[in-house]
Amino acid sequence: MKSFIKKQQFNYIKRCLFDLNNTFINCSDPNIINVSKLIAQDKILSCFDKLSEGEKEILNISKITTPLHIDIYLNDLNIYVFGMENITKNQLVKIFKKEKKLKIPNLDIKDKKLVYLGWIDEATKKLLITYNLNGNLLGMSCRLTESKPNSSNICTLCNHIGNSAEVGFVSPICKPKNQDDYKSLGFYICLN
């Protein structure tokens, strides 16, 4: 069967199964465990638009009866996960044409299951992000902001949960139309 799970959907499934794992560990009532499993199943299926019967069967978590089955399920599910398409150096230069002295990262990435391509330009201390939104490659240049150590953050793009070293707060660089206006937005994103 063809890959049908986006990387961010896979991360969401992992988060749902983490909650189910906590239920297995902290609860002894089988009725509560079954209800938690049904809620997790509903959450997983609701993050997909259209699924065939075969895809629904692959996403079925009814056979998970212990926390050990969760890791096996996720390993089996990982073969159906896909990421963004390959990006060329010319595409990056075109997207970030306003960036001076742009340093392109190594595009021979081992993990092809990326949600976005991002790298930190050490000279300017900027995070440069390329994301495929509905078939169009978008680029964004962001300021890195210090965040509290040992805090858990959730990546906006891929739903990965990590500490401040893995998921950082960034603010896109915005140029206002009027000099008196100031606008700053921010969000959490994976740094690796």
Per-range role (PLM):
Residues S141-N192:
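Cys/His-clustered metal-coordination modules, chiefly Zn-binding fingers
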Residues L20, L68, P105-L107, E166:
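Alpha-helical context
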Residues A123-S151:
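Short, charged surface segments at domain edges that flank catalytic/cofactor-binding sites
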Residues D71-K125, L133:
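N-terminal, charge-rich interaction modules
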Residues L17, N22-I25, D29-I32, D108, ...:
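Generic alpha-helix signal with a bias toward terminal, lower-confidence helices
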Residues M1-K97:
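General detector of N-terminal leader/presequence modules that precede the first folded domain
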Residues D49-N60, K126-I129, F187-N192:
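Short, Lys/Arg-enriched charge-dense amphipathic segments
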